[in-house]
A protein has these predicted regions:
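Hydrophobic alpha-helical segments with transmembrane-like composition
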Residues: 5, 14-121, 228
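C-terminal "closing" transmembrane helix and its immediate cytosolic amphipathic cap
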Residues: 200-214, 222-290
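Aromatic-anchored segments of alpha-helical transmembrane domains
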Residues: 4-12, 65-79, 138-152, 218-228
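Alpha-helical transmembrane segments and terminal signal-anchor/GPI-anchor hydrophobic tails
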Residues: 124-208, 213
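Hydrophobic cores of alpha-helical transmembrane segments in multi-pass inner/ER membrane proteins
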Residues: 35-48, 106-116, 187-198, 247-260
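Structural signal for the C-terminal ends of transmembrane alpha-helices
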Residues: 49-54, 112-124, 148-150, 197-204, ...
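Alpha-helical transmembrane segments of polytopic membrane proteins
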Residues: 31-37, 98-106, 180-187, 241-249
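Central hydrophobic cores of alpha-helical transmembrane segments
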Residues: 59-71, 131-142, 211-218, 270-271
């Protein structure tokens, strides 16, 4: 329901600012960040089905390895699958349709957390004892990632998760380079996730508040992006200067979207199911005991 509401909303916004010429509500191609909502729905559905199997530790590990294998090879076949579906079933099918490729690409990260026990999570969260060391490792790792993304062809496209090999392999590069790049993707992304988990604090702060309000921040942050795209004052800036500016701008944007007032004002459209339940309870006859 959240996807339907905000897909409609953002399609209308894109029409107003002129990014699309015709106002249509294409629900098969998620706009901007909404791919995650679609992918999350598929992952939750699969998780519910797997939960019914009552898997033991070996079963969970086996299923995870299978899912990781599917994810690992999926981008090798993306272009062929897209072409096959376009020719035989749906001409407008792409790797973006219903977040098809990203659902497969990022599936291991969701199920790594899904299958992990609370005890394992606790050990990971507390494995770096010194917060200063963790912070230095994270900053250095992020710096290296920026260098890698800038210096190696197709790495950014690889991390986006939505493209086939034509976007991250040069002509003539084969399965060996594919395996190397995809492995590096999972290792680096997993390492950054590990560092972020260790930097998370149990103490109440503005960051934990933003974490509690992450859905609202996530849903509405494209409004700031669309606004910046309509301005031209950064057009002559270098990429690094733009990056620094965007990082600075993200702070007040997150502050506003994560504020109590904004969250309170948008809670019903961000959580439509809860709103529906409250309305049912509110209008339920007082003498109706059932």
């Amino acid at each position: 329901m959240v996807y339907l509401i905000f897909q409609t909303f953002f399609r209308y916004i894109l029409y107003i600012i002129g990014d699309i010429e015709t106002l249509d509500y294409n629900f098969l191609r998620p706009e901007f960040h909404l791919w995650y909502v679609v992918s999350l729905s598929f992952w939750y559905l699969l998780a519910i089905l797997l939960n019914k199997l009552n898997l033991n530790t070996f079963g969970k590990l086996s299923v995870f390895i299978i899912l990781l294998g599917i994810s690992f090879i999926s981008r090798w076949y993306t272009d062929g699958i897209v072409e096959f579906v376009q020719e035989n079933y749906y001409e407008e099918f792409t790797s973006y349709t219903l977040s098809y490729q990203r659902t497969l690409s990022f599936m291991p990260f969701f199920f790594a957390g899904f299958f992990m026990t609370k005890n394992t999570f606790t050990k990971i969260y507390s494995s770096i004892k010194n917060i200063k060391i963790g912070t230095v490792l994270f900053i250095c790792s992020m710096f290296l990632v920026f260098l890698i993304v800038n210096d190696f062809y197709g790495i950014e496209a690889l991390y986006r998760g939505s493209f086939g090999t034509y976007r991250f392999l040069d002509d003539g590069q084969g399965v060996t380079v594919y395996i190397t790049k995809v492995i590096s993707h999972y290792i680096i992304a997993g390492w950054l996730c590990y560092l972020i988990m260790n930097l998370a604090s149990n103490k109440k702060s503005i960051f934990t508040k933003w974490g509690d309000h992450s859905l609202t921040i996530f849903i509405f942050h494209p409004l700031a992006v669309f606004l910046l795209r309509q301005t031209e004052f950064m057009s002559d800036w270098t990429p690094n200067t733009k990056l620094a500016a965007f990082l600075l701008i993200s702070i007040p944007v997150t502050w506003i979207l994560g504020s109590n007032n904004f969250v309170k004002g948008t809670k019903y459209i961000c959580n439509p199911y809860n709103f529906f339940i409250k309305m049912v309870v509110h209008f339920k006859p007082a003498n109706d005991k059932n």
